[in-house]
Amino acid sequence: MKKIDFYFDFASPNAYLSHKVIQKIKENYDVEVNYIPVLLGGIFKATNNKPPMEQFFGVKNKNEYQNLEMQRFIERHELNDFKMNPHFPVISLQIIRGAVAAEMDGFLEDYIDKVLVHMWEEPKKMDDPEVIKAAYEESGFDGEKLMTQMQDPEVKAKLISNTEAAVERGVFGLSLIHISE
């Protein structure tokens, strides 16, 4: 059985796009997926990288071409529910900490599925605590508990550890998929 390590942060539309394709792969192949929440901003800082919108600002046609490639990917994989979040870029620190808390409590995949909907299908301002809590409640999660867990030192430490381990593994941007036997 092949194993997929999927490093992700909800801040990137690529998290949504990659996750949806991974779901199709899981349906058709014998694979195990290990979801690893990391902080994209922390990866950028550690690797001296920048978001594409910033890095390629002023490079004629670069961002336009990147948007065209994204649209082609969406069409190719029939990801018709995707919508660019009008609040983009969203500071994802709280919801990615929520992913770590969900992982610790055993419902990470469900959490990912639902938070990605709130980010990229029914776009919400997912860096506003009131919006986040309401989205959690709408998803059937205990919003109060998750909001509290985001501040837990153990959750914070695990996110830092995941992010540092990703950088040590060579990650410099997201989403990243590592496949092994």
Task: Describe the residue ranges of each PLM region.
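Thioredoxin-like thiol-disulfide oxidoreductase module
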Residues: 152-171
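Histidine/lysine/aspartate-rich catalytic loop segments that bind and position anionic ligands
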Residues: 115-142
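Structural alpha/beta surface segment adjacent to cysteine/selenocysteine redox centers
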Residues: 17-119
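Local sequence-structure signature of Cys/Sec-based thiol-disulfide redox active-site neighborhoods
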Residues: 2-18
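Polar helix-capping/helix-linker motif
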Residues: 128, 151-152
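Conserved small/polar residues in nucleotide/adenosyl-binding loops
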Residues: 178-181
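Conserved segment of the thioredoxin-like fold in thiol-based oxidoreductases
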Residues: 139-151
